[in-house]
Curated annotation (Swiss-Prot):
GO cellular component: cytoplasm; ribosome
Keyword Oxidoreductase: no
Organism of this sequence: Klebsiella pneumoniae subsp. pneumoniae (strain ATCC 700721 / MGH 78578)
Name of the protein in question: Ribosome maturation factor RimM
Gene name as annotated: rimM
Pfam families: PRC_RimM, RimM
Superkingdom as given in the UniProt entry: Bacteria
């Protein structure tokens, strides 16, 4: 893997996908993209991976569709053995490479850890994950330890204006119109 070189850790890393199993004998790998449009993963370069605690830059040589998969060829990865060493490596970029969003749009990473409060002031907990359901995104909220309703986790739809009343990334709070009993 002579074409890979050591890199500095990204300031604000974000995972865009993951390398899957090798494909064929010439160093190709399957790739699993976490971007909204699977092919958008190729818009962000350079890719970084972390192997044995070291950050490395990997250079994309080529990519293509194969059946339902996307497969990639990285520079310097020329055989199945070299490709197998990269299986399960996360594909990471610095979040500064992401495009600016329009008002009212948010990256999931920016919502993680935000405190969620109802319009009446009841603290529902903190956002620990997000889910895509097809019709809308859903906040996964870990409830406070002493939740009055005995709820450990809440799923709240991210419906801007309807359920989501205000997102303040400066104070890391999300105000929702939601019944705490759900």
């Amino acid at each position: 893997m002579s074409k890979q070189h050591t890199a500095q850790a990204p300031v604000d890393p974000i995972v865009l996908g993951k390398m899957g199993s090798s494909y064929g004998i010439r160093g190709w790998l399957r790739v699993f993209s976490s971007t909204e449009d699977a092919e958008s993963i190729f818009d962000y370069q350079p890719w970084l991976i972390q192997k044995a605690g070291q950050w490395q830059v990997v250079e994309l040589e080529s990519w293509r569709h194969h059946n339902q998969d996307i497969i990639i060829k990285l520079k310097g990865v020329d055989d199945r053995d070299a490709a197998n060493l990269l299986t399960n490596c996360e594909i990471i970029v610095d979040s500064s490479q992401l495009p600016e969003l329009e008002e009212g749009d948010y990256y999931w990473k920016d919502l993680m850890g935000c405190q969620v409060v109802t319009t009446e002031g009841y603290s529902l907990g903190k956002v620990i994950d997000m889910m895509e359901t097809g019709s809308n995104d859903v906040l996964v909220i870990k409830a406070n330890l002493k939740d009055a309703f005995g709820i450990k986790e809440r799923l709240v739809p991210f419906l801007d204006g309807q359920v989501i009343k205000k997102v303040d990334l400066t104070t890391r709070t999300i105000e929702v119109d939601w019944d705490p009993g759900f």
